[in-house]
């Protein structure tokens, strides 16, 4: 496929998606649509890789230009916002908590969602080695397509050597000194306790499977809690946090044991609608606010 080019940005562009071909005999329209989209995705993989490479190159060039301009304007000093974050924080402290990313939902995700989950896990690892505090993280039910993604699609990741990160195909979850984090519970997580294991659902499903992690935790007898987001901030857009966000928020909490500060420092500015008045929301909350908190 020959990439189209934008003359202004000189970046490759994928061609508009073609119309869905006639449905083959013996297949439903939804089955054919899913298969055809997958085929188109595979067909365009080389082009998407080229687009990502061009965007990274353009971003590097723009950063060099900003850096050069800043150096000229600041007498040779690099502004704080342009300084790179060290890949590893050598002054890290042990948070004392353990985190499990429960990935036992492979069959409930499509290929793109598996890729998205693998990206979230790698970003969670990056956060775990850069933040001021780290946790011992274990990825359970690491098998099937997710493992294949790491072994084949992320060659060179060397994930089996990641520090404070363990991958296992075992699916068993602890039921003592453990908490399953899910937005579908009414119980709020007040604080993070060293010695406790916090379980995060490793699933990207665009909210198709309601109360999935909550029901699993209940079946296993594991207490459930939700992050106290609604008590401190309000979000705009989809009230969904990635696995990366959840882990990073927990690590940031240990900086000052301040949930509000942790949320504001981690969540993208585009998701922050306005800061909530914690004092008012502690005394009263409307049904809409309660629903928002459960949707997060």
UniProtKB/Swiss-Prot annotation:
Compartment annotation: Cytoplasm; Nucleus
Domain of life from the UniProt record: Eukaryota
GO biological process, one term: tRNA N1-guanine methylation
Residue span(s) of domain SAM-dependent MTase TRM10-type: 85-274
UniProt EC number: 2.1.1.221
Keyword Transferase on entry: yes
GO MF annotations in UniProt: tRNA (guanosine(9)-N1)-methyltransferase activity; tRNA binding
Active site residues per record: 205 (proton acceptor)
Residues noted as binding S-adenosyl-L-methionine in the record, renumbered to the chain: 181-182, 201, 205-209, 213, 227, 239-241
Record GO cellular component, one term: nucleus
Record's catalysed reaction(s): guanosine(9) in tRNA + S-adenosyl-L-methionine = N(1)-methylguanosine(9) in tRNA + S-adenosyl-L-homocysteine + H(+)
Keywords on record: Cytoplasm, Methyltransferase, Nucleus, S-adenosyl-L-methionine, Transferase, tRNA processing
Chain positions covered by the region annotation Disordered: 1-33, 277-296
Keyword rRNA-binding: no
Role summary: S-adenosyl-L-methionine-dependent guanine N(1)-methyltransferase that catalyzes the formation of N(1)-methylguanine at position 9 (m1G9) in cytoplasmic tRNA.
Protein family per UniProt: Belongs to the class IV-like SAM-binding methyltransferase superfamily. TRM10 family.
Subunit structure: Monomer.
Descriptive protein name: tRNA (guanine(9)-N1)-methyltransferase
Native source species: Eremothecium gossypii (strain ATCC 10895 / CBS 109.51 / FGSC 9923 / NRRL Y-1056)
Lineage per the UniProt record: Eukaryota, Fungi, Dikarya, Ascomycota, Saccharomycotina
Gene (UniProt): TRM10
């Amino acid at each position: 496929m020959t990439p189209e080019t934008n003359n202004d940005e000189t970046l490759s562009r994928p061609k508009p998606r073609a119309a869905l071909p006639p449905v083959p005999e013996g297949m439903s329209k939804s089955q054919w649509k899913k298969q055809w989209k997958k085929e188109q995705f595979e067909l365009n993989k080389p082009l998407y890789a080229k687009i990502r490479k061009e965007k990274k190159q353009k971003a590097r060039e723009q950063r060099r230009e900003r850096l050069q301009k800043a150096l000229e304007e600041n007498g040779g000093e690099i502004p704080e916002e342009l300084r790179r974050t060290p890949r590893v924080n050598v002054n890290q402290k042990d948070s004392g908590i353990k985190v499990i990313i429960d990935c036992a939902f492979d069959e409930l995700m499509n290929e793109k969602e598996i890729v998205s989950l693998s990206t979230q896990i790698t970003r969670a690892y990056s956060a775990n080695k850069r933040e001021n505090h780290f946790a011992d993280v274990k990825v359970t039910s690491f098998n099937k397509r997710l493992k294949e993604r790491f072994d084949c699609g992320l060659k060179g990741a060397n994930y089996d050597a990641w520090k404070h990160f363990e991958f296992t195909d075992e699916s068993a979850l602890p039921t003592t000194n453990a908490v399953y984090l899910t937005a579908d519970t009414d119980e709020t997580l007040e604080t993070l306790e060293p010695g406790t294991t916090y379980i995060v659902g490793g699933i990207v499903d665009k909210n198709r499977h309601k109360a999935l992690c909550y029901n699993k935790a209940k079946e296993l007898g594991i207490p459930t809690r939700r992050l106290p987001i609604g008590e401190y901030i309000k979000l705009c857009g989809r009230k969904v946090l990635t696995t990366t966000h959840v882990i990073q928020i927990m690590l940031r909490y240990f900086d000052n044991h301040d949930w509000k500060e942790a949320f504001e420092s981690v969540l993208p500015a585009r998701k922050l609608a306005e800061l909530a008045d914690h004092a008012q929301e502690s005394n009263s909350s409307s049904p809409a606010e309660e629903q928002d908190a459960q949707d997060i």
